[in-house]
Amino acid sequence: MKKQLIIGTRSSPLALWQAEFTKAELSRHFPELDITLKLVKTTGDVLLDSPLSKIGDMGLFTKDIEKHLITKEIDLAVHSLKDVPTATPDGLIITSFTEREDTRDVIISKNGVKLKDLPQNAKMATSSLRRMSQLLSLRPDLDIRDIRGNLNTRFQKFDNGEFDAMMLAYAGVFRLNFSDRISEILPHEVMLPAVGQGALGIETRVDDEQTREIVRILNHSTTEYCCRAERALLRHLQGGCQIPIGAYASFKNGTLTLLAYVGSVDGKIGLHNNITKTGLTSPEQAEAAGIELAEELLKQGADAILSQIRKTR
């Protein structure tokens, strides 16, 4: 058994929360382990002037940490799973999917105003094309503004009056104790989340069996089934930060239900579909369900939507 572990992480407050959480959970199971954090600056942390969709690089928040993992400067990397591309570099693997937080998105607005009650042409801040597409399908009048930076920076911009409202993931807002600022939690019927939203992905080297054995204890089986189904769908649609795709899977007693959305950036076209599979006994079967639903979406016309978006990004 290893005596030391080095966790690689970004330095944002939320990333540090995630890494400290992972460290605490591992220490609880393996009190003899000496666990330290190594902070890594990623491309996504540096390029803050451009919208994520314009940068066009997969792995903006993960690649630089993965380099440290490949060169054995760290033993594991802790990521927000929604930031992790569906294809990991050769030699690396997502070993654990931690138990998921609430996957829904939230509205932060002045005076607690809900989405439907925001004034005409309200300035809504989000860096996500997925959110933009679904928002504009509901409220085509909204003036969508790009917002980058960590959660604290975003709240600062909002409090300075740059926007009327902003949309964030509940998980991050809750973990950094901003829950009292939430105006509305949006149900999945209104806003499907990003693939993997609310879960952490713990990445290791494939050949580092000792670390994988240690880290696997943090794996949450239900979350793994759900996230592998969602990630398989996204992979089959060849999506990423540049594509408006939402998905949410639930899994109970061997039954997996997966909901998905593919839409145009302006929200004028939106495809919804879902699939339910019973008797699942392996995460690979969950992935197969994700691929099957992706195929259905492609038959519905997702291909044309995605091709058009890729031409213009």
From Swiss-Prot:
Associated pathway: Porphyrin-containing compound metabolism; protoporphyrin-IX biosynthesis; coproporphyrinogen-III from 5-aminolevulinate: step 2/4; Porphyrin-containing compound metabolism; chlorophyll biosynthesis
The protein's required cofactors: dipyrromethane
EC numbers: 2.5.1.61
UniProt GO molecular function: hydroxymethylbilane synthase activity
Alphabetical list of PANTHER family matching this protein: PORPHOBILINOGEN DEAMINASE
Misc note: The porphobilinogen subunits are added to the dipyrromethane group.
Name by which UniProt lists this protein: Porphobilinogen deaminase
Annotated source species: Pelodictyon phaeoclathratiforme (strain DSM 5477 / BU-1)
Organism phylogeny: Bacteria, Pseudomonadati, Chlorobiota, Chlorobiia, Chlorobiales
Gene coding for it: hemC
